Amino acid sequence: MSQNEHCQDSGEYFSAGTQGYFKNNMEDNLEVREDSLGDEVFDTVNSSIVSGESIRFFVNVNLEVQPSKSDLEAATGGCVLLHTSRKYLKLKNFEEEVRAHRDLDGFLAQASIILNETATSLDDVLRTMLNRFALDPNHAEPDCDLDLLMAKLFTDAGAPMESKVHLLSDTIQGVTATVRGVQYEQSWLCIICTMKTLQKRHVCISRLVRPQNWGENSCEVRFVILVLAPPKMKSTKTAMEVARTFATMFSDITFRQKLLKTRTEEEFKEALVHQRQLLTMMMPRAAGHSMSSLHTHRHPQPPKCKDFFPFGKGIWMDIMRRFPVYPMDFTDGIIGKSKSVGKYVTTTLFLYFACLLPTIAFGSLNDENTNGAIDVQKTIAGQSIGGLLYALFSGQPLVILLTTAPLAIYTQVIRVICDDYNLDFNAFYAWTGLWNSFFLALYAFLNLSLLMNLFKRSTEEIIALFISITFVLDAVKGMVKIFGKYYYGHHYHTKRTSSLVSLLGIGRSPNSSLHTALNASLLASPVEMATTSSPGSTHSGQATAVLSLLIMLGTLWLGYTLYQFKKSPYLHPCVRETLSDCALPIAVLSFSLIGSYGFQEIEMSKFRYNPSESLFEVAQIHSLSFKAIGSAMGLGFLLSLLFFIEQNLVAALVNAPENRLVKGTAYHWDLLLLAIINTGLSLFGLPWIHAAYPHSPLHVRALALVEERVENGHIYETIVDVKETRLTALGASVLVGLSLLLLPFPLQWIPKPVLYGLFLYIALTSLDGNQLFSRVALLLKEQTSYPPTHYIRRVPQRKIHYFTGLQILQLLLLCAFGMSSLPYMKMVFPLIMIAMIPIRYNLLPRIIEAKYLDVMDAEHRP
């Protein structure tokens, strides 16, 4: 059985709900190895379990190699046999095991810490650590041969060539087993060695300057822990026990990130002591979690009637959970050792452009759909006010509010109804928004956000992919309009020709003098004359269309290239991270300058702007009849369903366990706050806003510290820590509000193709981690290129494709209603989203077995 297969079976064993560990006695083997070095070699990696969101264990691998003889090599072609075995070890309990504290105290008293090790090969790193023992008087071992000790750390793999291939003899490496599969913790490696000539135990920790690739499952090593000890020791003092102590500490990904930030040995020691205190407090609590509770957490039960009462319980619990940490939302990353001012600045700039440009685009669309009742100026004002209030008072400030395409569609439907029935648009719009806020407040007080537990991961990803498609569709529609007007349309050329005729005074009354016509022609600007001269005028429209397409694709290319730049090997890591965080602002500014200044002789399509006569005007809600108010209630109810689903869905994606947020959730309070904000926006005729996808998950990603690992050639990222702050959303909202001073210029210098490129960028970046999109891509790949995901290993391939096909059908159903040309069909779009719940629970299990559905759903719910 291969190593990966064995790990997979182990993960399935523990997911069944049994806790325990396997232990093999290695003492005899270690003695034999000392007596006959080279006759028999071992490579050991130990395993352990921890309760919580997943199962953590260490892998113990023993490789036994018989030296190949020359004649045997000739017969077998250099092939040798490797025997692999594993055993499980529990994490050290710092609350109960006194030895764990003594191991750490002994290390701190005679610490051997190497910071910023520049060596790149494992041999050089270990030799540096052994030399540290030799030079340190506290670790003097007069009878120890360093060359022999170095040889014992490695195992000859039996390679027939003169250059031997080395395998570590005895190591510990952390592994996390979840329902999604097995993940190696590749940033640290604990190496164990026993030797009779050693007098006492020794521990050395080396922190590498850069991650090193030392083979499979060790592709991003930053820490090396070396444990040396004599073989004859008390059972609680063996090399394995000491290694288990330090392996337990390094199994915490947050702790490893803290160690990376330390600058001196004293800070390194302080981090070790602090981690011991945390483990002492957390171990009893962690031990109380059972595997059954973990299983329930991953697959929450549907809420019962009693869960929705008492009235307002969820709101009160949210406030009590979030209020104690409210001051920290302003100080985290600003005060203390872990400062993140630079990341806050880049994230604020990213949010500013990510919010402002869609706001301008949808504001221009609202201006066209409402005949100027809601324009760009009002849309920017509403975005700024709503964003400020939500960033200040929300329970989860990482969620970003934004007006969206479905809301623009609802606004268009309201305008059509008002025109058909001769109603006051502002009053009817206000009543629809008030009813929407009333239902949202009712949902919040009744704790209906608990119903979101019914949404499986597959359903969430269908809706998320639908939103990404709408961004792509908006960009394509905009580009089609540009080509229709400038490339194919005759109206543009006729308009240009007529402007030339009027410019020269041809066709005027007989009283017009030639002198006036000549003056008009001479006073015309060079650009205007260039665009109206022949034959260039017949091609200027085509140039506009082609340039618009290039600018849109260029904005997408530059933005996404810089976004992925942090994964490249070029420049310093800090520079790569800064460029990645500022990818969107750089792309927008660059191609705005190219479109507006690089090609001044070519006309570019810009958004429509008409300044509002009264920015804040209260709607005359008393002017409508009771019948019209009742009609607005129906629209408000359907709109509230859209708000409810979008708000809770995006909040669930932000609060997902893999994001490692620690300050708690506030679904019910945030829903009530959303109702309050939209009440004010409705009364003043400003566009509605709700939680935006993918802006909110991208906001989390921008504030996250990420650790990478490589498995089978595929790079996976794990979020280590997220700065849960209000400052970035506050700063972006303030900048959006100040953008009102930039209207009409210089904001109108941003061509529409740049906005469309932004839409494509947002859609493309939102596909990262979307399992539905990944499974659709499998249809275009050969089977040997399939990634080693959990569903590939545990679900038959035919079932995977069946499930993907059924999800695509649901996605097409959403698109049929959400993108319909009939406005009234778009209004029932929220009902279609709700209809996916019975489809998932009642229809899909009849086609695909429930056990396979659960694996592919891989439910993660806070």
UniProtKB/Swiss-Prot annotation:
Q: Report the domain of life of the source organism.
A: Eukaryota
Post-translational modification, briefly? Glycosylated.
* Location(s) in or outside the cell: Cell membrane; Basolateral cell membrane
Q: Where is the signal peptide?
A: none
Q: As annotated in Swiss-Prot or TrEMBL, what is the tissue specificity of this protein? A: Expressed in the endothelial cells of the cornea. In the inner ear, is located in fibrocytes underlying the stria vascularis. In the kidney, is expressed in the thin descending limb of Henle loop.
Q: Upon deletion of the gene, what happens?
A: Mutant mice show corneal defects characterized by progressive thickening of the stroma and descement membrane concomitant with increased sodium chloride concentration in the stroma. They show impaired urinary concentration, increased urinary volume, and increased urinary sodium loss in the kidney. They also show stress-induced morphological changes of fibrocytes of the inner ear resulting in deafness.
Check the record and name the Pfam families matching this protein.
HCO3_cotransp
Q: What does the record list as GO biological process?
A: cellular hypotonic response; cellular response to oxidative stress; fluid transport; intracellular monoatomic cation homeostasis; monoatomic anion transport; monoatomic ion homeostasis; regulation of mesenchymal stem cell differentiation; regulation of mitochondrial membrane potential
Q: Give the GO molecular function terms.
A: active borate transmembrane transporter activity; bicarbonate transmembrane transporter activity; protein dimerization activity; proton channel activity; proton transmembrane transporter activity; sodium channel activity; solute:inorganic anion antiporter activity; symporter activity
Q: Which residues lie on this side of the membrane: Extracellular?
A: 367-379, 416-428, 482-542, 600-627, 692-721, 771-774, 820-823
Glyco sites are at N511, N519
Sorted UniProt keywords: Anion exchange, Cell membrane, Glycoprotein, Ion transport, Membrane, Symport, Transmembrane, Transmembrane helix, Transport
Tell me what topology the record assigns in the membrane.
Answer: Multi-pass membrane protein
Record SUPFAM superfamilies: Phoshotransferase/anion transport protein
GO cellular component terms, semicolon-separated: apical plasma membrane; basolateral plasma membrane; vesicle membrane
Give the transmembrane ranges: 344-366, 380-393, 399-415, 429-452, 461-481, 543-564, 578-599, 628-645, 671-691, 722-746, 753-770, 775-797, 803-819, 824-844
- Major localisation: membrane
Q: Which residues lie on this side of the membrane: Cytoplasmic?
A: 1-343, 394-398, 453-460, 565-577, 646-670, 747-752, 798-802, 845-862
Described purpose of this protein according to its UniProt entry:
Multifunctional transporter with an impact in cell morphology and differentiation. In the presence of borate B(OH)4(-), acts as a voltage-dependent electrogenic Na(+)-coupled B(OH)4(-) cotransporter controlling boron homeostasis. At early stages of stem cell differentiation, participates in synergy with ITGA5-ITGB1 and ITGAV-ITGB3 integrins and BMPR1A to promote cell adhesion and contractility that drives differentiation toward osteogenic commitment while inhibiting adipogenesis.
Q: How does it assemble?
A: Homodimer.
**What family does the entry list?**
Belongs to the anion exchanger (TC 2.A.31) family.
Q: What is this protein called?
A: Solute carrier family 4 member 11
Species name = Mus musculus (Mouse)
